[in-house]
Regions:
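Hydrophobic, well-ordered secondary-structure elements that form the walls
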Residues: 9, 124, 159
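P-loop (Walker A) phosphate-binding loop of NTP-binding proteins
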Residues: 63
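Glycine-rich phosphate-binding loop used to anchor ATP phosphates in small-molecule kinases
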Residues: 97-156, 168-170
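Small-molecule kinase domains that catalyze NTP-dependent phosphoryl transfer to phosphate-bearing small molecules
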Residues: 153-217
Length: 217
């Protein structure tokens, strides 16, 4: 290296770095103690008692324009009116950025579902999620006892009438799906509106023991 005088531009020194010995590794006595992970001091039972509900993930799956979002927000409204605590994750909000070309959920979705469920809230997803493996990843993350799978199986003509994105326009490849083997419920907007479906889904949550039965009255 060289050192240059900034006023005269004259070289005033030069040298070479030959290297040095690497610092010795920590011995066991010198190694700093690992920080212990801090865990929540609020148990799931305490949250359930305070909120009057058990945290869970409600997953609405179905083809595009089947009415998943309408049902999700109607269910959120119904639960709110019953003094329950719920939130919706919808394809049009910022949390949904990163949906894969095959319709798979963003990579962070299982962790989001688990954390909100652990907090004792009811989180309602309105993703198409056509792949069965994608939905099973969410089930594995939150646990089967806290995962409620709803198949929104609205008929093609009704989906076409609701289609705002041109998914069913001529020339488009019809979307496909791997329907659930054993969903907690199969619903549609063929003969019922979203509010009526939401009422039935509250009963599903009761049956699963996630809500007290009196709240559907």
């Amino acid at each position: 290296f060289i050192l240059v005088d900034s006023l005269t531009n004259n070289t005033v020194a030069a040298g070479m770095i030959l290297g040095g010995e690497a610092a010795p590794p920590y011995t066991e006595s010198q190694r700093p103690p690992a920080l212990a992970r801090v865990h929540t001091q609020v148990s799931a039972d305490e949250r359930s008692e305070r909120l009057g509900q058990k945290g869970c993930t409600v997953w609405l799956t179905g083809l595009p324009a089947a009415g998943k979002s309408a049902i999700a927000f109607a269910l959120e409204r119904r639960l709110f009116d019953l003094k329950r605590f719920a939130m919706v994750v919808d394809p049009d909000d910022g949390l949904s950025k990163g949906v894969q070309p095959d319709g798979s959920s963003p990579w962070q979705t299982p962790e989001l579902a688990r954390r909100v469920t652990d907090a004792g809230l009811i989180i309602i997803f309105a993703y198409a999620s056509p792949l069965r493996a994608d939905r099973e990843a969410i089930r594995d993350a939150v646990g089967s006892e806290r995962f409620v799978e709803i198949h929104v199986n609205t008929a093609l003509e009704a989906r076409r009438s609701r289609d705002a994105r041109g998914v069913y326009s001529p020339g488009h490849v019809p979307p496909g799906e791997e329907p659930p083997h054993e969903p907690d419920a199969i619903v549609s907007l063929d003969e019922h509106d979203a509010e009526e479906v939401a009422y039935e889904l509250v009963k599903v949550l009761e049956k699963r023991g996630l809500l007290p039965s009196t709240y559907a009255l």
